[in-house]
A protein has these predicted regions:
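N-terminal glycine-rich phosphate-binding loop for ADP-containing cofactors
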Residues: 1-535, 539-542, 551-571, 575-584, ...
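Extended, composition-driven regions rather than compact fold-specific motifs
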Residues: 546-548
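Short alpha-helical segment that forms part of, or immediately flanks, the ligand-binding pocket
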Residues: 600
């Protein structure tokens, strides 16, 4: 019988092992982190009188892994306090601890024999029903456990996390012929629900799915680089321009990614594939390019050695980044690529449409894409059914493991399956069986959309199969395709989620808030009065909300439409107050960037169900403003409600914290940190898997209905501290200005903020005021700042550069 996964052991505290343990801790799963006992005591430990018998020495490697994770940037932990969930130890003294664990993850060095020796010891200590897996990226899963007990092999499989585990969605689950189906199901479900992973079932083939396809594409691209490259020899800058966002890939593109990962890591992966794929039709490609060999010899390994394809040198405010010249092997100044087709394609927002347009270009950009994408399509199609039985797994692996916007087959559909096949026929290139079967069955695409459902072409049946969405996943585009959209305007929609729950969805550019959003919020509130039991505020874009529409605000300011500015702020305030005191529960479901007005909406919702990766902050000071849709008010209300009630207690410390968080535009690095910053309350909850966020928020709303939700009434008992608090905050601004931490205009903005937080700065003693009183102060400060030239400059700079101006 399988054990419920409540405690996990990670064997190996290297980069991956430690970070897997950290992510388990992020998910509130107690984890053991074990590693070997060091063979020697370094001089610094000897100086402390330590020997190999001391626990500090024996656990040093595991502790070092944990400490490195605590220091890593971007942060591995949601909050540092989660480290308490991890217990460190060593294999010699503490391996027996695994008897209390439900899942044991082996993550030691990539050596089959080392893994086998450790696992042979572990198998005698396992609790009945415990699951054991390996995080190997390339060794055969079955071969590692060959000859082990049958009970062990039935509970044995591969679980390949991608680095860094917190941020990379992909978890490849690789069963063997012996693995029990219920073990695969248990690990997949746990990875999905508890760890927030996108699960891809892979076959036990070399490097599984993502690294097999990803390495092929990388090597194909490397073959185009330098003076000896195919198709004319592209520079490093050209290739990174072509294989970044223009292609729907991450900004780090090809060479920056290799610098981050490590050139030596690429070499290890390629050598493994070269040795493991004697019959691969493109085995000729799985070889180390000569310039990579030269880089290894010169220790140009990327970030770990301070130089790789790029090298940062001192100079100027931020230093200068040089590029390796693959001909001279000297570093030179970066050169701007001259690719006119690429510049023109930047105006096309959709990545698939952009790639389609670039493929048709007769210029170098078009030549590059025709070669690289044509090879990728051909190779991926030939990997079915070798590495996977379906195209969806390959597409998801590339999207979740390599951060591609679209999968290989999704891109192929966009370009045209038949069009590519016709080109191959002209080149006398064999058509892969998958594409041949698709086209001979009179079908034109690998995916089919109809009635809100997605279907994919299945090689085995030669027909489309429905792409099943697991329980607990709601797709808003699917609901809209099935006519569940109740109302719509250019900025927002109201959607019926079923079971009496409506959804207010933003869909303006970057989900910024404008009049359309406010109007639809009122429509949602009206729907609550006309039959719906609850409302979720959520969407499934890249980010929840980046704040108010600054362009509309700037136009109103420049045209002197002050009544319009007043009215826009008042309307947003009124909408948020209506949400806060709605007759039925309103649940916000933020994720990703949730800034400014997006935070204010969350603050006024009955509950928040946030994705674990939610980056919340009231950032208005960055554009010379303060939060004025109730955000400043609500943060003050929460602070004062949390203030100690003891006689003589001074609540200013809590007001000061709000002042600093808003005044410094602090943005959380996770939903858990957002709770510590006060943007989320103790009542709010978190979803590890963003795919489940809308469904989780809907269930939370229904739970509130079931519990007999009752709205409160607008407050008139909020304590403000008056002149003493105002003076303290102004003193803080003065000291920060003297220390040159802030500018003169930061002091101006901060003073307006301090005035609101102190209740207007006029009361000589603490007073009780209403929410409306504070809202009026917010609005007055906001409009006053809009009339300042330096605020206008900040808004213009943000719109042009996408980052704040400190003037």
């Amino acid at each position: 019988m399988l054990r419920e996964i409540r405690k996990v052991a990670v064997l190996g505290a290297g980069t991956m092992g430690a970070r897997i343990a950290v992510h388990l801790a992020n998910a509130s799963i107690p984890a053991l982190l074990l590693d070997i006992v060091p063979r020697e005591v370094p001089p610094e430990e000897q100086a402390k009188g330590l020997t190999l018998d001391h626990l500090q020495v024996r656990n040093r490697l595991a502790m070092a892994g944990l400490e490195a994770a605590l220091k890593s940037r971007p942060a591995a932990f949601f909050v540092p306090e989660a480290a308490r969930m991890i217990t460190v130890g060593n294999f010699e003294d503490n391996l027996a601890w695994i008897k209390d664990c439900d899942w044991i993850i082996e993550a030691v060095t990539e050596d089959r024999n080392i893994k086998r020796v450790l696992l042979e010891k572990a198998q005698a200590l396992l609790a009945p029903g415990a699951i054991v897996s390996t995080n190997t990226s390339g060794i055969s899963i079955a071969s590692i456990a060959e000859g082990f007990r049958e009970e062990f092999r039935r509970h044995w499989l591969g679980t390949h996390f991608f680095n860094p585990p917190r941020y990379m969605k992909l978890l490849e689950v690789i069963p063997t012929a012996d693995t029990l189906p219920e073990v695969v199901e248990a690990v997949s479900r746990f990875g999905d629900e508890a760890l927030g992973k996108g699960i891809v079932l892979a076959k036990d083939t070399p490097n599984f799915i993502a690294n097999r396809i990803g390495t092929f594409v990388t090597l194909d691209v490397l073959g185009m680089a330098g003076p000896d490259g195919q198709q004319g020899g592209y520079t490093i800058e050209e290739i990174d321009a072509l294989t970044g966002p223009a292609m729907g890939l991450p900004k780090s593109a090809t060479f920056r990614t290799l610098d981050i990962v490590g050139i030596d890591v690429l070499v290890h992966v390629v050598k493994n594939l070269e040795a493991s794929l004697p019959h691969d039709e493109r085995r000729d490609l799985f070889r180390i390019p000569d310039f990579i060999t030269r880089m290894i010899e010169r220790k140009l390994l990327g970030e770990k050695t301070g130089q790789g394809f790029y090298k940062k040198v001192k100079g100027g405010d931020e230093g200068e980044i040089l590029t390796l010249d693959l001909q001279t092997f000297e570093y030179r100044a970066r050169q701007k690529p001259k690719l006119p087709a690429l510049e023109m394609a930047k105006n096309v927002e959709d990545a698939r449409q952009r790639v389609t347009a670039l493929l048709q270009s007769p210029e170098r950009a078009g030549e590059f894409y025709r070669k690289v994408l044509g090879d990728a399509f051909h190779y991926a199609a030939n990997r079915i059914p070798e590495i996977s039985d379906d195209i969806v797994s390959i597409d998801n692996a590339m999207k979740w493991g390599f951060n591609w916007e679209s999968g290989v087959f999704e891109l192929w559909d966009a370009v045209g399956v038949e069009k590519i096949a016709e080109q191959w026929k002209k080149e006398k290139r064999p058509i892969p069986p998958l594409a041949e079967k698709l086209l001979t069955s009179s079908k034109k695409a690998f995916y089919q959309q109809s009635d809100g459902l997605t279907r994919y072409f299945d090689l085995r049946s030669g027909d489309y199969r429905a792409l099943e969405q697991g329980p607990g996943v709601i797709l808003l585009p699917s609901l809209k395709a099935r006519k569940r959209e109740i109302k719509k305007n250019p900025g927002a929609s109201l959607i019926d989620l079923g079971d009496g729950v409506a959804c207010l969805e933003f869909h303006s550019k970057m989900n910024s808030i404008g009049a359309d959003t406010v109007q639809m919020a009122h429509a949602g509130l009206k729907a609550l009065n006309e039959g719906f039991d609850a409302m979720v505020i959520g969407n499934q874009a890249a980010n929840f909300c980046v704040g108010a529409n600054l362009m509309l605000l700037l136009v109103a300011i420049q045209e002197g439409e002050w009544d319009d500015v007043h009215q826009a702020v008042r309307a947003f305030q009124s909408a948020n107050m209506a949400l806060k005191y709605a007759p039925k529960p309103v649940v916000a479901a933020p994720f990703g960037l949730t800034l400014g007005g997006g935070v204010e909406i969350c603050l006024h919702s009955a509950r928040v169900r946030a994705a674990a990766e939610t980056y919340m902050g009231l950032v208005e000071v960055g554009v010379g403003l303060i939060p004025a849709a109730g955000g400043t008010k609500e943060m003050l209300v929460r602070a004062m409600d949390a203030a100690p009630r003891d006689e003589g207690a001074d609540p200013f410390a809590l007001v000061k914290e709000v002042f600093q968080n808003i005044g410094m535009a602090r943005v959380s690095t996770s939903a858990e940190e957002a709770r510590r910053l006060g943007y989320l309350s103790a009542r709010d909850s978190i979803s590890m898997n963003r795919d489940r966020l809308i469904a989780d928020a809907k269930q939370l709303a229904l739970d509130l209905v079931k519990l007999g939700f009752r709205p409160g009434k607008p407050r008139d008992d909020i304590q403000v501290l008056g002149q003493s608090a105002f003076a303290k905050m102004k003193l803080g601004l003065h000291l920060m200005r003297r220390a040159e931490f802030i500018s003169d205009y930061d002091v101006v903005v901060g003073t307006h903020l301090a005035k609101v937080l102190s209740g207007g700065g006029e009361f000589t003693s603490p007073q009780r005021v209403s929410e409306q009183y504070l809202l009026d102060l917010e609005r007055e400060a906001f409009v006053s700042l809009c009339g300042q030239r330096k605020t206008v400059e900040r808004i213009q700079h943000m719109l042009k550069k996408g980052k704040p101006l400190r003037n």
